Amino acid sequence: MIENWHRGFVLHRREYSETSLLVDFFTEEHGRVTLLAKGARRPRSPLKAVLQPFTPLLLRWSGKGDLKTLTKAEPASLTLPMQTLALYSGFYVNEVLARVLENQTAYPELFQHYLQCMTRLATQPKQIEPILRTFEFQMLKALGYGVNFSICAATGDPVSPSMTYQFRENQGFIASLLQNNYTFLGKDLLAFEQLNFSDKATLQAAKRFTRMALKPYLGSQPLKSRELFQSILPNKLKSS
């Protein structure tokens, strides 16, 4: 039984019976946890207004089985003010985390990166793409996706900014004479290593790489947040 307060955010919620919710949280000490929020769908439930995305929460839960019960949830601060593109980008981040995080596995450093990501989305709406790419690289590192962007995987030589490298899953980047969807310029790889996405071409290459690297974690099922983005803002999907 867990009695202490824990910091967390709502990642996803779904109906459970006529009056309750199952809620996926991302917590600082326990990673992703799924809790039963009893009565949270009732009109007068204090949980109804509290269990919203992008609100920093203090949580308590109890129980001995796999599915534990949320006993208390309070806002730790005001909801982060997401607007339009930032809002859908935040939903995208939440959906990806809900899919890729192991249940009840702590990711304390990633939790801090998530908090920074959400804060930046709320306060820097013109920097959405660099913010998302930065978090995706941080997330891949937290998941154990060990790619060295500064070393050629075949030779061990330092990556040259002027050369082209082909990405090979489970191996890394090797020097290549080819140019296709799996190849990247050395200068871009070195920028990836530093999380430097100030160059537009590097930013586009980073998006191509993260889509490629996240695919094994996300599977073939389309992201609902991306579909929603396409239907509502078809001309601005580039932001996610």
From Swiss-Prot:
Cross-referenced Pfam families: RecO_C, RecO_N
GO process annotations (BP): DNA recombination; double-strand break repair
Alphabetized UniProt keyword annotations: DNA damage, DNA recombination, DNA repair
Any one GO cellular component localisation term in the record: bacterial nucleoid
InterPro entries listed in its UniProt record: ARFGAP/RecO, DNA_rep/recomb_RecO_N, NA-bd_OB-fold, RecO, RecO_C
Regions that span the bilayer: none
Taxonomic superkingdom: Bacteria
Family under the similarity heading: Belongs to the RecO family.
Function as written in the Swiss-Prot or TrEMBL entry: Involved in DNA repair and RecF pathway recombination.
The protein's name: DNA repair protein RecO
Organism: Actinobacillus pleuropneumoniae serotype 5b (strain L20)
